């Protein structure tokens, strides 16, 4: 089943209207799957289904050596205990309102399916909006949408390992510094590590690789070959910006970005299954009005397992 068919099954307009706009469990599951599949960084995350506004996830681990030399007939007198802790997901409510004028229904070239087509477009945009909040959310932001929650960037800066590139340009050194910042215990599952980067950072890094006068360098200029550093893939995330502004050492920058390094399984998203798509009419404005409502949350399972490089100039 294609993504379009999956979404169409999840958002059968007639069924939604009959149900008062509340998606049934099967529709919710399909819509949530669609949202995740249309994302990039969030697609790598472990998605936690939620039936309440908040949910706690139990963590268990052993933080130090637990083995000792064995001696016959002797009690080692040392017993390690697992460490228990919790991650709390606290959802925020998001509404996506939109409207379609009567003229669109009357004069479009798609025909009777125009409503479903437009709803699918907005569903795709919702996936992008969710991922933007997961990554760029900051409760101190002046942006009323982004201030809903602290996202992966903010958590990485405040609870993870921060490397300040101080306005320097795209380079292999940035990725190397991040790898150095990450505690060694998180390098054991090396294959799960990912660098999450902006499209312009990826482009700049591929240009560096492409300067090598070898076939290995050519492939980064001539194909969509995924770039790596020390065997760790770079994942291009369209919603990571490359136009952040900051004054660094008295010099204003308008082309800054950041890079996040973490294991994929360290990323967590939560979404409440009580999703709604409601519809109404404004007969005076001659419009049909719609509202998607969702509740979402995000976290790292272990903030200590993330490193972030800030203040990278993509044109320096």
Task: Describe the function of each predicted region.
Residues 2-39, 44-54, 150-170, 177, ...:
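Sequence/fold signature of self-assembling virion shell proteins
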Residues 18-99:
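Assembly/oligomerization interface modules of large self-assembling protein complexes
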Residues 66-67, 108, 131, 204-206, ...:
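Short helix/loop capping segments that flank catalytic or ligand/cofactor-binding pockets
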Residues 102-181, 311-316:
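Alpha-helical scaffold segments that mediate packing/assembly in large oligomeric complexes
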């Amino acid at each position: 089943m294609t993504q379009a068919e999956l979404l169409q099954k999840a958002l059968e307009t007639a069924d939604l209207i009959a149900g008062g706009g509340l998606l049934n469990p099967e529709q919710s599951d399909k819509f949530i799957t669609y949202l995740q599949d249309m994302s990039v960084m969030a697609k790598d995350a472990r998605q936690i289904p939620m039936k309440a506004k908040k949910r706690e996830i139990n963590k268990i681990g052993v933080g130090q050596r637990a083995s000792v030399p064995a001696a016959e007939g002797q009690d080692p007198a040392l017993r390690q205990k697992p460490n228990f802790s919790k991650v709390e997901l606290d959802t925020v409510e998001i509404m996506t309102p939109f409207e379609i004028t009567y003229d669109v229904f009357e004069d479009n070239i798609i025909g009777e399916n125009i409503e479903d087509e437009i709803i699918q477009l907005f569903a795709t945009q919702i996936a992008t909006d969710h991922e933007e909040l997961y990554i760029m959310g900051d409760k101190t932001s002046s942006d009323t949408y982004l201030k809903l929650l602290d996202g992966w960037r903010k958590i990485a800066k405040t609870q993870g390992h921060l490397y300040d590139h101080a306005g320097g340009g795209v380079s292999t050194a940035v990725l190397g510094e991040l790898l150095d910042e990450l505690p060694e215990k998180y390098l054991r599952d090396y294959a799960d590590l990912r660098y999450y980067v902006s499209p312009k950072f990826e482009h700049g890094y591929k240009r560096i690789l492409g300067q090598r006068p070898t076939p290995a360098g050519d492939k980064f200029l001539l194909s969509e070959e995924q770039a790596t550093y020390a065997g760790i893939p770079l994942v291009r995330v369209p919603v990571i910006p490359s136009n952040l502004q900051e004054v660094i050492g008295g010099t204003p920058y308008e082309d800054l970005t950041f890079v996040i390094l973490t294991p994929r399984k360290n990323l967590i998203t939560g979404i409440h299954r009580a999703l709604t798509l409601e519809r109404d009419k404004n007969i005076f404005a001659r419009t049909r009005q719609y509202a998607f409502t969702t509740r979402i949350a995000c976290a790292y399972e272990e903030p200590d397992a993330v490193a972030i490089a800030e203040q990278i100039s993509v044109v320096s």
